[in-house]
Amino acid sequence: MANIFEVPQPGNDLLEKANKVRLASIEISQTENQNRIKALNFMADYLEKNSYEILDANNADYSSAQKKGISRALLSRLKLSKLKLNSGIEGVRKVGDLADPVNQVQIKRELSKGLFLERKTVPIGVLGVIFESRPDAVMQISSLAIRSGNGVMLKGGSEANLTNTAIVKALQEGLNASGLDKNAICLLTSRKDSMAMLNLEKYINLIIPRGSNELVKFIQENTRIPVLGHADGICHLFIDIEANLEMALSVALDSKIQYPAACNAIETLLLHKDIAPTFLEKAIPLFKSNDVKLIGDMRSVELGVKYEASLEDWKTEYLDLILSIKIVDDLEEAITHIQKYSSKHTDGIITENSHTANKFMNVIDSAGVFHNCSTRFADGFRYGFGAEVGISTQTLPPRGPVGLEGLVTYKYFLKGDGNIVDDFSSGKAIYTHKDL
């Protein structure tokens, strides 16, 4: 690991950039709600004005990546079509339609006569986001950061440098036109800077890595800055004996092929032994016609799956048109397999038996547990969050798709009238603890 990634000390140029973002984040944290919404609309406007430059930059990045032999999964994430760009721009505007996450009063309580406590949401400060390939993530992350009153330092994959630079330039122009400090959004383009970010604990309040398992684990182990993220997206779908066969086929197919490079696409399909023969008879040609390579355990190979799986396959995130299949004796074996290999991202079950579904959903300790629907629904936009800055598989909150609510923290505001603790110790004053 140390041979691949190193954590250098930040140079003066990076320190200067980080300080500018920190100062801009302080300004934005004090900005009224309507001004942050205004900024998002200007950011969207300037993305539209610069759309041809952005698409040209992406074409250049994509062509270069193809020549370098980058994997199909990364190429899929890198490609920014006109449709995807327009969707991203619309997403920036829609973030402005979401409820303001800042200054929300969570607790309002009279502690005693003349002593009042409030707990209110406040921006985190500066986000450091490291991600691979997907240039549309720049729009998502930046809009969520500004909406929640935060600054953001971005580091995308080098294969998308031209695209990311064009997008950030447009976003900064929009911020500036709206009257806010354009330095609230900063793009880093070198690997050295992305690693040196890990030593910016005086400037960055939260690191959000969106990349390979290896990268995420390295970041988690090599920074004093809190890290929000997930290392793997090994998602499972269990087809129960009491599953509706047509539903099972449809959901399994969507969960794999709708966007195989996504972290919420399934990597392993578990089949109850009594439904496996009928299911595979229809599923094998269906997956084959969609160019999905099926890899299975011995029992599934005996039922027509072409390639035999190894132990490594059960813990592999393919991010491609490859699917591992395992036949299990019952629900308990399916649960045992998932508990052993799941990355705690999203796992689902197809069954008409509500008792079976409830047991599965209550026992499986993943951020998302789904019944009779595609795992591809595990997404901030589809959850109604507007967009997501990432997905967290940690047990402590925020968990699952992280939208605006995950980009604020809270502070306690206590207002008194000369109150002192000694008066309560001596009995001169009493606590009322009355919620207001």
Curated annotation (Swiss-Prot):
Domain of life, source organism: Bacteria
Single Gene Ontology MF annotation: glutamate-5-semialdehyde dehydrogenase activity
Any single GO CC term annotated in Swiss-Prot or TrEMBL for this entry: cytoplasm
One Pfam family, short name: Aldedh
UniProt keyword list: Amino-acid biosynthesis, Cytoplasm, NADP, Oxidoreductase, Proline biosynthesis
Enzyme Commission no: 1.2.1.41
Reactions accelerated catalytically: L-glutamate 5-semialdehyde + phosphate + NADP(+) = L-glutamyl 5-phosphate + NADPH + H(+)
Involved pathway(s): Amino-acid biosynthesis; L-proline biosynthesis; L-glutamate 5-semialdehyde from L-glutamate: step 2/2
Gene Ontology annotations of biological process type: L-proline biosynthetic process
Major localization class: cytoplasm
SUPFAM superfamilies reported in the protein's UniProt record: ALDH-like
Similarity field: Belongs to the gamma-glutamyl phosphate reductase family.
Role: Catalyzes the NADPH-dependent reduction of L-glutamate 5-phosphate into L-glutamate 5-semialdehyde and phosphate. The product spontaneously undergoes cyclization to form 1-pyrroline-5-carboxylate.
Protein name in UniProt: Gamma-glutamyl phosphate reductase
Species classification: Bacteria, Bacillati, Cyanobacteriota, Cyanophyceae, Synechococcales
GN (gene name): proA
